[in-house]
């Protein structure tokens, strides 16, 4: 493991303020340690460093062998009109269309920069796979994920077009991806 810091800003003259990201590079055989200690990979620095960069960030770790579904959760997973496909690569137009609708519906944009906020940027060096969720044979949502080994899966962006909010696809996707 190699640790390094990106000192973004700070003011030490009158204040003791330092804003710095703690980053790391791990060897493949150190990934388990990284995940178990709150590190997650990101690709922001990849072009500069040429390696997968990890950040120590708040995240959720589940031991899937211990996840048990309630009757209500099992019922949610029996929705007959929802189908899921796994893709090894992404269709930019498909994901972009879903993402744009998601950003608009949820108001996840910065005022004055709406058009920029709605762009699904994929200058990403993590080789994501995709759960594509279909409602009545129409793609309506996706989740990106990366499998590291038989114990560690990283979940990335989720987006849903919200054309039918009563579908509860956020809940459905969360449950589906845990099974």
Kindly label every feature range from the protein language model:
Residues 21-28, 88-96, 171:
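Generic detection of long, well-ordered alpha-helical segments
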Residues 2-83:
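Acyl-donor-binding surface of acyltransferase catalytic domains
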Residues 33, 98-101, 176:
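Amphipathic alpha-helical segments that form well-ordered structural scaffolds
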Residues 51-55, 120, 176:
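Short, surface-exposed, charged/polar-biased interaction segments
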């Amino acid at each position: 493991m190699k640790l390094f810091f990106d000192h973004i800003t700070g003011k030490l003259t009158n204040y003791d303020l330092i804003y710095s990201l703690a980053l790391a590079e791990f060897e493949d055989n150190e990934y388990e340690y990284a995940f178990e200690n709150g590190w997650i990979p990101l690709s922001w620095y990849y072009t500069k460093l040429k390696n997968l960069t990890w950040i120590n960030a708040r995240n959720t770790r589940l031991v899937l062998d211990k996840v048990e579904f309630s009757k209500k959760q099992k019922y949610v997973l029996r929705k007959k009109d929802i189908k899921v496909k796994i893709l090894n690569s992404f269709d930019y137009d498909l994901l972009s269309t879903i993402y744009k609708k998601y950003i608009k519906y949820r108001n996840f944009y910065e005022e004055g920069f709406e058009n920029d906020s709605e762009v699904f940027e994929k200058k990403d060096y993590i080789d994501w796979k995709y759960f594509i969720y279909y409602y009545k044979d129409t793609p309506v949502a996706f989740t990106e994920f990366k499998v590291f080994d038989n114990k560690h899966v990283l979940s990335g962006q989720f987006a849903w077009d919200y054309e039918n909010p009563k579908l509860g696809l956020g809940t459905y996707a969360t449950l589906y991806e845990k099974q």
